[in-house]
Amino acid sequence: MSFKVYDPIAELIATQFPTSNPDLQIINNDVLVVSPHKITLPMGPQNAGDVTNKAYVDQAVMSAAVPVASSTTVGTIQMAGDLEGSSGTNPIIAANKITLNKLQKIGPKMVIGNPNSDWNNTQEIELDSSFRIVDNRLNAGIVPISSTDPNKSNTVIPAPQQNGLFYLDSSGRVWVWAEHYYKCITPSRYISKWMGVGDFQELTVGQSVMWDSGRPSIETVSTQGLEVEWISSTNFTLSSLYLIPIVVKVTICIPLLGQPDQMAKFVLYSVSSAQQPRTGIVLTTDSSRSSAPIVSEYITVNWFEPKSYSVQLKEVNSDSGTTVTICSDKWLANPFLDCWITIEEVG
């Protein structure tokens, strides 16, 4: 019995490449394999000169160490520190990586921005009149109200549910909630001004300059800041009401007798909770001339003795008529020149 072992390589060499050496299995000419036929090498190379296959090359590339790129070496770009991703996936700055010490240092009282409509014009802008916020307003924590006094509003304004709110009334004043009522924190609230003959108004000694303090009586348990009269369900009597204390600034300007200049003096005093909501300022003289006019040029007062021009600033209760001295100074006033008083609420 005889048989033959088929050797495809030897057959290829013997039939296709007659000039090759079949014993050494050396191919001296080009090998042309017509599609779809191909030469398959299932094993990877063993020696340096061996032919290899695709699987071996792919594995070698995947496991190869690629150097970091430098000025002389081609390699990878290291995405470390503040950057994430890779050069092929659009690297971005990682979250919370830009800290203050990594920002550009700018000068004092400066911000970085674009001062005009030109693109790519980011620069330092000084915090002065050239710095503006366009189409944006600071309104957090500010509640506009339609009335001029939230304590006397026709519509109920509830007590704030949280502290730190500001209320802007229709006259531009700012209010805050003070436990039982709204308190105006805008300084120097103008109340009234009485002039002398220059305004064709006559202020006489003993005449009260009345003003509305703008603060109503409020029941102690009220949380709305409104004027109320609470009737007890037990004895049907009114509960105790109290007034909101305020601070009043009174400025008085009096032409002094025998002197060419006027004297201007202001005094601060508190309108306590024990007083009525309407209080007056009165100019008083000594008891001998309590009703003598001091600022009217139309009344002759030359026969008055100098002591009759001694005027003093007092407070009068509009209900009881009682007076309280709010300034101990007295002045000798010239009855032929104008006198005026300005009353302001300052606290």
Swiss-Prot record:
Entries under InterPro entries matching the protein: DUF5907
Top-level taxonomic group: Viruses
Protein name: Uncharacterized protein 008L
Organism per entry: Invertebrate iridescent virus 3
